């Protein structure tokens, strides 16, 4: 049996743009993608912290070090520049490995510069305890 687990997330990134007329996707600074282990064209969920909307799209690489987080295509109607979002990717893993699995978490500042990168371990000083 497989379990769907959080593979990685870019936590509380700031949307730098929204391009309604682009084909679709989310453009993410390629350095952030590498840190979060997100590949080009990989499916990602976007959770808009500012407005509570959620949608799925796919990632494309933006200029490294630019901090770009740009929502493209129809999903551009679901965000505004300056909104705070969480970008999540998923993995299917064997059930017997799920309990020990730890996702990659990339925390960024308001310019989308990474501040920390860590794994989340519930119950041991993780985000779960902070909520």
Curated annotation (Swiss-Prot):
Keyword Cytoplasm: yes
EC category name: lyase
Superkingdom classification of source: Bacteria
Any single Gene Ontology cellular-component annotation: cytosol
One matching Pfam family: Asp_decarbox
InterPro entries the record matches: Asp_de-COase-like_dom_sf, Asp_decarbox
Membrane found in the keyword field: no
GO MF terms held by the record: aspartate 1-decarboxylase activity
Cofactor: pyruvate
Annotated segments matching region Disordered: 112-131
Signal peptide: none
Residues annotated with Pyruvic acid (Ser) modification: 25
Protein family according to the UniProt entry: Belongs to the PanD family.
Subunit structure: Heterooctamer of four alpha and four beta subunits.
Name of the featured protein: Aspartate 1-decarboxylase
Organism: Syntrophotalea carbinolica (strain DSM 2380 / NBRC 103641 / GraBd1) (Pelobacter carbinolicus)
